[in-house]
Amino acid sequence: QEAIEVGIEPDIAEEIITVLIRSSLTKQEKDRVEAEGKGNGRSVLVIGGAGRMGRWFVDFFNSQGFETFVADKNIQNDTHSYSDWREAGIDFDVIIVATPIEVSAGILSELSEKKPSGLIFDIGSLKTPLRDGLNALKDSDCMITSLHPMFGPETELLSGRHLIFVDVGNKEATDKAKELFESTMVKKLDMNIDDHDRLIAYVLGLSHALNIVFFTALSGSGEAAPKLAKLSSTTFDAQLLVSEAVASDSPELYFEIQKLNEYGIEPLDALCTSATMLREIVMNDDQKSFIELMEKGKKYLDSRS
């Protein structure tokens, strides 16, 4: 009401207030992370630290007062940088593996032979492809755990974000990893390897696949494709926004998420089955089944609120 009285659209006023609140919370969180820094001069090696999520962790640990080292094939050797992680050695308080999933699997296995004494964790989107390397580190009595940040490298405020901790048999390591994020407002979730990948098959695998199918159908629509680019509707624009984000991300990472998950085919089958069911309902002019489908979906989505 106050916005209307001063000539500002309520939606715009709400958006401005939301931005201001998030900006304030972001500053508070950053100040707290710096003030309660867990680093105290301790050292951390981020393998894959020149990548997008790798850089996020480099910045995060720098802000906590860690002496941060980066190993990445795309950088040159320097006092705190290595093009080959093996050249960095293993004498670090924390070692983070932030490389593509298949690369991470090999690095974890190699680390198990070197037996670092510090905390070790990966940040992979999938865990089943890393099972052997994680178990090898556990069997070598290393301080190993596994994390999955459910947020992207552009994230500044961790409030409302989720960080999954996958204990692989060393609770002390998992607890130490959690301590690193105590000064943030991130929501910590605990899962085992198999439950994690079953859920991720739907949370990431299905949502990615749905958007890939969506923009593939649009781009393959023939003569309609250029005309579609000029049309707009609330639902279409919302879906398009998500699909554009998916299409702009790493196709290599998205393929890994689809291909390497032991549980990845199930949601793809469910997507195909659902699309076929919808097609048959429409082809058969079955309004009753269509309404039931919509109501069933609404009931499920309402239950998530």
Language-model features and meaning:
Residues Q1-S43, Q64-E67, D72:
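N-terminal hydrophobic or amphipathic helices and topogenic motifs
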Residues V44-G48:
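Conserved N-terminal Rossmann-fold NAD(P)-binding element of oxidoreductases
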Residues R52-M53:
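Hydrophobic/small residue at the entry helix of a nucleotide-binding pocket
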Residues W56, N62-S81:
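NAD(P)-binding Rossmann-fold cofactor-contacting core
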Residues W85-L137:
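Rossmann-fold NAD(P) dinucleotide-binding segment
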Residues K227-D302:
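Interdomain hinge/lid region at the active-site interface
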